[in-house]
Amino acid sequence: MDQEKVIVIDFGGQYNQLVARRVRECNVYCEIYSYKTDLAQIKAMNPKGIILTGGPNSCYEDGAPTCTKELFELGVPVLGLCYGAQLMQHVLGGKVEKAPVREYGKTETFVDKSSALFSDVSEKTIVWMSHFDYISQIAPGFKIVAHTADCPVAAAECTEKNLYAIQFHPEVLHTQEGTKMLHNFVRGVCGCAGTWTVSYTHLRAHELRRISYAVFCL
C-alpha cells in the first residue's frame, strides 16, 4: 500500500524546509517540489494534500512564480502560506496588491474558531507575519476566517473545495499555535492517519535496495 504523502510546492521562500519538517512532525510523509513541476506529475503522486510555500515575489507581477488554476481543481486539499495564499487568491479571481501597512514580526491575530484550521486554537493568538502585499479581495467562494488590525484577510477558506489560504507563517515557532494549525490541516482536513515514521522510510529504502539487488542478480 502506498504511504500517505503531502506535497510542498516551493515558491522560493526561506522556510520551505521548515514547512516540510512540521508536516513530518505530524507523522505524515512529505516531499518538496519546485513550482515548475508538471501538474500531471503532481497528480500521479496521488497526494493527500498540497502546501504552497511563501516566496519573495509579488504574484501579480510579470514573471513571478505561479501555478495553473487546475492545481486547485484536483480535488486535493490545498493550503497556501503567505505568497502561496496570495497566489491562490490571485489565480482564482481575488485581488492582491501592495499593503498600505507592511506587517513584519509577531502579530496579534483574531481567528474564526469554527474553521477546521483553527480547531482548538485560541480566538486571539500570536502569529508571525512577513509580507508587503496583501489580499485586498478574496476569490469567489471564499470566506475570511482570520484578521489582524492591519490585515483584513489573515486567513480565508473555501470549504467546498478544501482550499485554505493563510497570510502568516504557521511553520515558524514565533506563531504560537502554528504547529496545531498545520496538524489541523494535515491530519484533519487532509485526513492523514499519521502513521509515518522515519524508521519506516529507512525500512522502505532497505527493501528497495534489496529488490534492486535481486533484479541485478537475475
Predicted regions and their residues:
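RNA-binding accessory domains that recognize and position tRNA/RNA substrates
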Residues: 1-49, 58, 72-73, 90-204, ...
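Structural motif
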Residues: 51-53
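Short, well-ordered alpha-helical scaffold segments within catalytic/effector domains
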Residues: 65-68, 203
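Catalytic-core regions built around general acid/base machinery
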Residues: 67-75
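Glycan-recognition surfaces in beta-rich domains, encompassing non-catalytic CBMs
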Residues: 215
